[in-house]
Regions:
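A short amphipathic helical element positioned immediately N-terminal to and/or at the very start
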Residues: 1-11, 113, 117
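Transmembrane helix-loop-helix hairpins at lipid-water interfaces of multipass membrane proteins
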Residues: 10, 16-73, 77, 151-156, ...
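An intracellular "coupling" helix at the cytosolic face of ABC transporter transmembrane type-1 domains
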Residues: 11-14, 99-103, 119-136, 140, ...
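Hydrophobic alpha-helical transmembrane segments of ABC transporter permease domains
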Residues: 21, 29-33, 70, 118-164, ...
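Short intracellular "coupling" helices and adjacent cytoplasmic loop segments at the cytosolic face
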Residues: 47-48, 83, 91-115, 119-121, ...
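Helix-loop-helix
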Residues: 49, 148-163, 176, 233-306, ...
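ABC-type nucleotide-binding domain
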Residues: 326-576
Length: 576
């Protein structure tokens, strides 16, 4: 997995290599200082040789200055490498998400995807940038060089800290094995916190309207406490690393002082050599502590890396594998014995044995009770989901044979949940066509009756919509979305209950405008109100995922029980 993660460093690898080179030279210079100090004490101070003291002092100062410059360089290069790696991983994840089908997205919670794009990437990033690269590069070099020098000073004394190495290794392995699953749980707790915050902010108006602020506060307190507890469990285990290392380190130093003192007394070791040896032992033990911290950081990064790889390794179930270089020309639609379920392991189909035919330019209404899979049915046309059995055809060709870009360019959907983006009204309309002229935009707005209220907006087409279009009503938002879809100039237009917030008079104008101005466009209208579909060329009745009846308003009113019941209930409610 590490190899895959670091493959995203790409053009930033040179900065990582430069950082490691700077770190390596910096460490060598730092390790020269104790050797120079030993010579200064044993040959300069001991014999009062002032010129020798000055010479060694200048050499030590030069090493320190060069090490400082290289330290700054390594910090800069490692930061560039870490930030670049993080940016590339985020981009790779985001690109992968754009290729997800609806069923792929259903495998993850939105809050979890946000965490995997932010917090998890930051953990990987930190393991490469200053906080990770420097100790990762410094510790092995310091350990190898300092150990070699320590043995060259006195091999007998060096055996003391060799005893400590297996103890330190065993302690570190035990901590890592225990802490890795705790880091995974902590990241999952962050997912839950993000989900709670996201839901609250998205539905803040509902929360206020139902006076549920206290309930939401309690819910947040619960997930916040859960994150705190999971974090405490992880970090309680992590902090054991430092005192355990220090215990072994101080015990080792004490042993070296006892044995070294005896060697000095016997004349087998100079005071400067003992001082230098202790300096190298401290360097060795500090390098081991740094390595242990690096391992802990890598453990957390690996937990995050595994979550990131789940996003990148998600198998895309809707591809262009069977696609040919063709485009939708007419908008003829055919469902041929289609069966569909969201999950392969599900026992029952959501849609069963669906068959119907729509001629180019026809207007087709789809009506049925809530939960009858009306939306699911139309989502099969642009391949937001793929059928399990049967075939969906456009212009006599299986939709799987169209390149997805060409297929979806030819189909415009106005979904149940109307989405507007931050920006001006004009920029939202141009989502339908970036190159649309103002004349085309005004024409689309006229058909969708947007022109009826646009003059009342503070800045007309330049009015800022706010996040999600908060400064326009539900009906106005629906009309804007319809205009946006018209600007796409599709061969097939799907309106999924997208006039539910529009009054019947305005809805009639929109219907008339679509019929007169866009007669060749195939139109599919999902609706709850019979008034929205009664003028359609064909009306399809769905019931529990099956077609219960098809025909015109008059024929269904004459012989379809479900249609009659809907008609009578709405007639009583004065909707017709």
């Amino acid at each position: 997995m590490l190899k895959r993660i670091f493959s995203y460093m790409k053009q930033y690898k040179k900065y990582a290599y430069l950082a490691l080179v700077c770190i390596g030279i910096e460490v060598v210079l730092e390790l020269m200082v104790p050797m120079l100090m030993a010579d200064l004490i044993d040959y300069g101070v001991a014999y009062a040789d002032i010129p020798y003291i000055y010479t060694k002092g200048i050499q030590m100062g030069g090493c320190a200055i060069l090490a400082l410059i290289l330290g700054i360089g390594s910090s800069k290069f490692s930061a560039l490498a870490g930030q670049g790696l993080g940016a590339n991983i985020r981009m790779a994840e985001y690109e992968k998400l754009q290729s997800y089908s609806f069923s792929n997205i259903d495998h993850f919670r939105v809050s979890s995807l946000v965490t995997r794009l932010t917090s998890d990437v930051t953990n990987i990033q930190n393991s490469v940038s200053i906080t990770g690269m420097r100790p990762f590069g410094r510790s092995p070099v310091m350990l190898i060089v300092a150990t070699s020098v320590a043995f060259s000073i006195n091999s007998t004394l060096a055996l003391v800290f060799l005893v400590a190495l297996p103890i330190l290794a065993a302690m570190l392995i035990a901590i890592i094995v225990h802490i890795r699953p705790l880091y995974t749980k902590m990241q999952t707790a962050i997912d839950l916190l993000n989900r709670t915050v996201g839901e609250n902010l998205t539905a803040i108006r509902v929360v206020k309207a139902y006076v549920r602020g206290d309930y939401e506060l309690e819910k947040f307190e619960e997930v916040n406490d859960n994150l705190k507890k999971q974090s405490e469990k992880a970090f309680k285990s992590a902090v054991l690393n430092m005192p355990a290392m220090q215990l072994v380190m101080y015990s080792t130093i004490l042993g070296i002082l006892l044995l070294g003192g005896q060697l000095v007394k016997l004349g087998e070791l100079g005071i400067g050599q003992l001082t230098s040896f202790l300096s190298y032992v401290l360097i060795i033990l500090n390098s081991l502590m740094m390595m242990s911290n690096v391992f802990l950081m890598m453990t957390r990064s690996l937990a995050s890396g595994a979550r990131i790889m789940e996003v990148l390794d998600e198998k895309i179930d809707i591809t262009d594998e069977l696609a040919r270089d063709i485009s939708v020309e007419r908008g003829e639609i055919e469902f041929d014995h289609v069966n569909f379920k969201y999950k392969e392991e599900a026992e029952e189909y959501v849609l069963s044995d669906i068959s119907f035919h729509i001629e180019p330019g026809q207007t087709v209404g789809i009506i049925g009770q809530t939960g009858s899979a009306k939306t699911t049915l139309v989502q099969l046309i642009p391949r937001l989901y793929d059928v399990n059995e049967g075939v969906v055809k456009i212009d006599g060709v299986d939709v799987k044979e169209y390149p997805m870009r060409h297929l979806r360019d030819a189909i415009a959907m106005v979904l149940q949940k109307n989405t507007l983006f931050s920006g001006s009204l004009l920029s939202n309309l141009r989502w339908g066509s970036e190159d649309a002229t103002m004349e085309e935009i005004e024409e689309a707005c006229h058909i969708a009756c947007v022109d009826e209220f646009i003059d009342r907006l503070s800045d007309g087409y330049d009015t800022e919509m706010g996040q999600g279009g908060v400064n326009v009503s539900g009906g106005q938002k629906q009309r804007i979305c319809i205009a946006r879809a018209i600007l796409k100039k599709p061969r097939v237009l799907i309106l999924d209950d997208s006039t539910s917030a529009v009054d019947t008079a305005t809805e009639a104008k929109i219907r008339e405008g679509l019929a007169k101005k866009l007669p060749d466009m195939t139109k599919i209208v999902i609706a709850q109100r019979i008034s929205s579909v009664r003028h359609a060329d064909l009306i399809i009745i769905l019931d529990k995922g099956r077609i219960n009846g098809m025909g015109t308003h008059e024929s269904l009113l004459a012989d379809n029980r479900i249609y009659q019941e809907i008609y009578e209930s709405q007639k009583e409610g004065a909707e017709l």
